[in-house]
């Protein structure tokens, strides 16, 4: 056990951690140069295209130093804020972490968030300054930033370039020398944490585990602690870079894959503890709490016959993504679909993209919203995920909305505009720190609802892409909120309802109906687009009707003939207007997001 090293890699997006992981794999000789695919650790197409890590991956490597043989278990983690739940579980199964910072860009907001998670798990941190081959690299300045913002000693930071391979061997030696070996009692009852799970079409649900005490053997009867279910271990494997290698036992301190042959991945939940069924351990590795969704959106198939296929697709995605939650819902405008809960905006985009790509579905997504706690006059408390479900105004005593603590790190030249953006989003400043003369760290408390719309895009455009952002939920607070309904041709479209602060209802209503007017195709009758609070209409635009020349086929002749045709058309349009349905294009549902 003394020669095992379990370590994670934590970094902000684009600071080069997947490339660095590939270099470490290559340096350990686990993969030949020919087999080394770009980003071995990112297996999904979306991950490779977007250059982000979504699912935490793991790999077991062999390394020889001074004639001694070491086993390095590398646990790659996602860097994006939405996937911090995955990060926290990966860190719980590690003994140390490489903190990677880009030598040109410096410390970013998500780096700090993940460092705090690592500190909570008492991990040994090795600061690594990557991309030292870049012309703009300034390792000394970045080392100072690490000390200022995080407060850890960066004098012995390892300087590497994952692209050129400089400093990789020194880094692996540092891992062996500085990260502690795992501690655990090999004679105690089995105790292992599941830090990742996914679905394999041949083997069923697989759990990636780190064993803290005891060992797991093939054919052992194990118990999952959160739900008490018992299952037999059918197979055990080590995650090697290119293929999994079977093993009869996973010992204390090791990581491995457990095959339980289950059809449902919900049984194998990330963060849960596995123990021996006959001789269980007393307490779990960490208290299991399921990942909580923060952002909700309706997802509907464009073709209503695809509803069952969408259900199957969501079920299959949930096999690999335990944080995804969904329930069926119906919308008058969009038919049958699902209300899906996501960890954040990127998670929502990725899920929608995977549904469309991997399952060939055409989908419409409604605007995202958050959970509201609504207290009624009779003392009842209800949780509303969908703005269209908000009760009538006269029944509501008060509405509470979730607030988050937002951390923004930005070059100081964009500070003024970013503060204006945060104030417009109803944010209140709690802290401001200068990391050095060029970069500032801001902390604000902001309603979550303001973040899910378009905050991230605006932040990036104001700062030309240089500002970074991270958030954590804090609490629910009372807000003066109202439901803004959009009516098209006199009918409220439930999928377009949004919850807004009362003082913003009028400007937002005006912008929305104006956007909708541009998007709705012209009909043979005129269409009124209205924004309303309850029964009161606060804004209106009209989509003009198309003209059709019904008199074209009359040559000369009597005016009464033409008049008769025009009257007939007028009647037809009147009837059409009363029973006509307006087909709304997908852009209409996303126009809610564009509030400018």
Swiss-Prot record:
Bilayer-spanning residue ranges: none
Gene Ontology biological-process entries: positive regulation of translation
This protein's GO CC annotations: plasma membrane
InterPro entries named in the record: EF-4, EFG_III/V, EFG_V-like, G_TR_CS, LepA_C_sf, LepA_CTD, LepA_IV, P-loop_NTPase
Top-level taxonomic group: Bacteria
Binding site for GTP: 14-19, 130-133
Membrane association type: Peripheral membrane protein
Name of one Pfam family that matches: EFG_C
Its EC number(s): 3.6.5.n1
Example of a GO MF term: translation elongation factor activity
Primary site of residence: membrane
Keyword Lyase carried by entry: no
Compartments where located: Cell inner membrane
Domain tr-type G, first and last residues per copy: 2-183
Family membership noted in the UniProt record: Belongs to the TRAFAC class translation factor GTPase superfamily. Classic translation factor GTPase family. LepA subfamily.
Role of this protein: Required for accurate and efficient protein synthesis under certain stress conditions. May act as a fidelity factor of the translation reaction, by catalyzing a one-codon backward translocation of tRNAs on improperly translocated ribosomes. Back-translocation proceeds from a post-translocation (POST) complex to a pre-translocation (PRE) complex, thus giving elongation factor G a second chance to translocate the tRNAs correctly. Binds to ribosomes in a GTP-dependent manner.
The protein's name: Elongation factor 4
Organism field: Sulfurimonas denitrificans (strain ATCC 33889 / DSM 1251) (Thiomicrospira denitrificans (strain ATCC 33889 / DSM 1251))
């Amino acid at each position: 056990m003394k020669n095992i090293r379990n370590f994670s890699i934590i970094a902000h997006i684009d600071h080069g951690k997947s490339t660095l992981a590939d270099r470490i794999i290559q340096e350990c000789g686990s993969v030949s140069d020919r087999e080394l695919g770009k980003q071995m650790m990112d297996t999904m197409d979306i991950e490779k295209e977007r250059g982000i890590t979504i699912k935490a991956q793991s790999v077991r490597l062999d390394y020889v130093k001074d004639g001694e043989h070491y086993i390095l278990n590398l646990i790659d983690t996602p860097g994006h804020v939405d996937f911090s739940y995955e990060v926290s579980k990966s860190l719980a199964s590690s003994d140390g972490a490489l903190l990677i910072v880009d030598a040109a860009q410096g410390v970013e907001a998500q780096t700090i968030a993940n460092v705090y998670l690592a500190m909570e798990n008492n991990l040994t941190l090795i600061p690594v300054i990557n991309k030292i081959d870049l012309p703009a690299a300034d390792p000394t300045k970045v080392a100072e930033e690490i000390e200022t913002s995080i407060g850890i000693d960066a004098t012995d930071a390892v300087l590497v370039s994952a692209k050129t391979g400089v400093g990789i061997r020194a880094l692996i030696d540092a891992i062996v020398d500085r990260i502690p070996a795992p501690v655990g009692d090999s004679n105690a009852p089995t105790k292992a944490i599941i830090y990742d799970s996914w679905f394999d079409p041949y083997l069923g649900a697989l759990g990636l585990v780190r064993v803290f005490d005891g060992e797991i053997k093939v054919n052992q009867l194990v118990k999952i602690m959160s739900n008490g279910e018992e299952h037999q271990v059918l197979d055990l494997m080590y995650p090697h870079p290119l293929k999994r290698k079977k093993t009869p036992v996973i010992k204390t301190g090791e990581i491995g894959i457990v095959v339980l042959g289950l059809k449902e991945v919900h049984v194998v939940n990330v963060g849960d503890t596995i123990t021996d069924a006959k001789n269980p351990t007393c307490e779990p590795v960490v208290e299991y709490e399921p990942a909580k969704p923060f952002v909700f959106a309706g997802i509907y198939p464009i073709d209503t016959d695809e509803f069952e296929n969408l259900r199957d697709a969501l079920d299959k995605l949930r096999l690999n993504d335990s944080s995804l939650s969904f329930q069926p819902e119906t919308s008058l405008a969009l038919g049958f679909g699902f209300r899906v809960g996501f960890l954040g905006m990127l998670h929502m985009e990725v899920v929608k993209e995977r549904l469309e790509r991997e399952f060939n579905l055409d989908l419409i997504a409604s605007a995202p919203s958050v959970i509201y706690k609504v207290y009624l006059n009779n003392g009842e408390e209800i949780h509303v995920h969908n703005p269209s479900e908000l009760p009538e105004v006269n029944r509501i005593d008060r509405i509470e909305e979730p607030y988050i603590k937002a951390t923004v790190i930005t070059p100081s030249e964009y500070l003024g505009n970013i503060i204006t953006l945060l104030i417009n989003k109803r944010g209140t400043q709690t802290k401001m720190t200068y990391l050095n003369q060029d970069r500032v760290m801001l902390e604000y408390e902001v309603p979550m609802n303001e973040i899910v719309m378009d905050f991230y895009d605006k932040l990036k455009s104001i700062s030309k892409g240089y500002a970074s952002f991270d958030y954590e939920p804090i609490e629910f607070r009372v807000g003066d909120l109202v439901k803004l309904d959009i009516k098209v041709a006199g009918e409220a479209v439930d999928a377009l309802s949004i919850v807004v602060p009362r003082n913003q209802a009028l400007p937002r209503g005006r912008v929305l109906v104006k956007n909708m007017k541009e998007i709705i195709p012209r009909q043979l009758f005129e269409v009124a687009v209205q924004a309303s609070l309850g029964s009161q209409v606060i804004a209106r635009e009209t989509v003009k009707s198309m003209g059709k020349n019904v008199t074209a086929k009359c040559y000369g002749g009597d005016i009464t003939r033409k008049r008769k045709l025009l009257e007939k058309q007028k009647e037809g349009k009147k009837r059409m207007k009363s029973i006509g349905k307006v087909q709304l294009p997908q852009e209409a549902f996303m126009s809610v997001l564009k509030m400018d």
